[in-house]
Amino acid sequence: MQKYDAIVVGAGNGGLSSACTLAKAGKRVLLIEQHNLPGGVASSFRRGRFEFETALHELAAIGKPGARGEVYELVNENYGVPITWIPVPDLFRAIHVQDDGTVLRDFTMPHGRQAFMDKMEEYAPGNREAVAKFYELFDECKAALNYIASANGSPDPKVLRKQYPNFLRVGSYSPMDVLTALKFTDDAKRIMGTYWSYMAVDMYRLSSIVYLMMVGDLVDGGAYIMEHTSHQLTTGMLEAFRRFGGESWFNVRAEEILFKDGRACGVRTTQGTVYADHIVWNGNPNMAFATMVPKGVIPERELKLANARKFSARMFVVYIGLNRTAEELGIKDYNIFISPGLDTADEYKRVGRMEKIRSTAALCYNVANPNIGPPGTCQMSFTMAYSKDVWGDVELRDYVNLKNQKAREILELYERATKTSIIPYIEEIAVATPWTFCRYAAVPEGGVYGYEAAGWDNCMARMMSLDRDFTIPGLKFTGAAGPRGDGFSESMLTGNIVGKMVLGEMAKEGK
């Protein structure tokens, strides 16, 4: 019988982080991955002479020398992964464009608190004090989350009330509530709401904590990408895991989580059965409950929670390799958010329907990393997040034509908004729909972001309930559906938190 201290199922960002934390602590850990590569969607793929980044737009919480962020401390310093981080030039450019090509607004925001504040004052005068208060709130919320993480999910309420009162106040409110309370003007709110499409939840329902952490970290510490795509990150974490003594099985599918007396005790795989007293599942709990866990051991609370939650962000992505350089095409921006500029609640409803694409996050990787592809070329991606399972209604016979139609719509939108011609120079193109992500990453409806961090299921509620939300003995969940929410940074930080929680339980068990 093969027995481990812990088994981690899934080598995505969260699973790799949990595995590294456990293995570095000296535990015997097995990492199981169904594919032949680590990373899940944190990877790359090749078409022709181009290697495309699969998912990452930019990473926060890296920071600069002397002021490193949480992700740099975790990945580079704690796990010892030698990644060279490349800074993204600006925070973002946003273009609000109508169907006829009329541009309503076009603004570019920089990194850095002071620079951001100055530029905000240029675009929306009278908001300097509001931005300053926003950052006071960000600092407090970040410190509060760090405290909760250090307490392994069991923070002292007295400490929170005394040291982080505003964190408790804003946790149940939306970003729009917070911006209104801080007295941002309407123009400033529109600028501050640009990142909503990253989360695929409108500014009236999104968790204010998630929003504060994302915007605050990106403005404060800047945004970064890896020199060699996110495949470099996940293979580096895998190497660290093995260096810590961990064992990994690839091309092996987990088929069932085993239980004894109501406690998880092992995993049945396509290569046999392995045992451990602690199982970490890097994936959506709904998938585990539906396919991997015997119904009799799932508490009623967990079933109700899973059914009450709402899947988030079903991704549609177009990847293109062009046979011209960014300079030749006149492309100067790394990251452009293109939309009609509607209220975010209206935008959210619109992306819940299968209609003409009017919004996208467009990236040109060569602007940040000129050496990412072959000489004389550049590569781009265009992402749209659907708020509902509209692709689930597509008939198989219509799928290819619809996919290609939507790809053309998103490319024409970019050309219309930026007045830049790219379609004639496309050498390679690949299109990923929610079906693609559902198949590859085994996520319901293609929702790679897990659950919407909104309303009652907000980030603060999840973090405050860490010690109560894992009710199945021996089984914990990590990744984008975890307590800190979605995204590369949050998945890795969640993985570390879950790993530490398992270590805490092992210590109590005398292991």
Q: What is each residue range found by the language model?
A:
Residues 100-206:
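Rossmann-like flavin
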Residues 259, 504-511:
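Active-site-proximal substrate-binding core of FAD-dependent oxidoreductases
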Residues 325-435:
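C-terminal segments that line or cap access tunnels to active or ligand-binding sites in enzymes
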Residues 185, 189-199, 357-363, 420-484:
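A glycine-rich dinucleotide-binding beta-alpha-beta segment and adjacent secondary-structure elements
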Residues 2-140:
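N-terminal glycine-rich phosphate/pyrophosphate-binding loop and immediately adjacent elements
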Residues 56, 480-502:
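A conserved FAD-binding loop/helix module that cradles the flavin
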Residues 212-264, 269-270:
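Helical element adjacent to the flavin cofactor pocket in flavoenzyme catalytic cores
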Residues 255-374:
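Mid-domain catalytic core of redox enzymes
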